[in-house]
Amino acid sequence: STSPFYPLFAALDVNAKMHEGQSGQRLWADCVRVGIEARKLLMKTCKYIKPFVPAQIDGKSWGDYPTDEIAQNLRFFEFEPTAKWHNFEGYGEHQYFVDPCKFLLTTPGIDAETGNYADFGVPATILANFLRENAIVPEKCDLNSILFLMTPAEDTAKMEHLITQIKRFEEFLDADAPLADVLPSIY
């Protein structure tokens, strides 16, 4: 087009300036820390929905490490070829890592160690629709995972609200609530 869209150019210029130098690094470092704290809170609060990170590092719970240590060390996000928490195969040491700015959660239903279906499961699409009914929109979901993209706009309050809603969803699971109560808009 010969007519540029000036609001878009202005937004790009502002974004570039915000991320210039140390300020951009600080914005994203804070985002990573918020994501780590959210994973820790989810581990403490919820029993069915889990963050997609190793449960333990060197025999110690992932969530028991200091946030800054986790943020500064990629081993907390590493796919180790022999690890069973993800059960992925066919890659080398230090080849793949979980992106700390992708808040990826798993729902029960597939045993990660064997790849077999578990006796109890919750399709992530049900959780996604529950969250949408409560004004939280996930980026995407599949059978047993749901993804939220972290940006510097996320803060502790937003993540705590998300986890509170996930905890509410788990309470519906424990109560074996009818789907009409969990997702009233479909009825």
List each language-model region with its residue ranges.
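PLP-dependent aminotransferase class I/II
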Residues: T2-A16
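Non-catalytic terminal extensions of PLP-dependent enzymes
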Residues: Q22-Y187
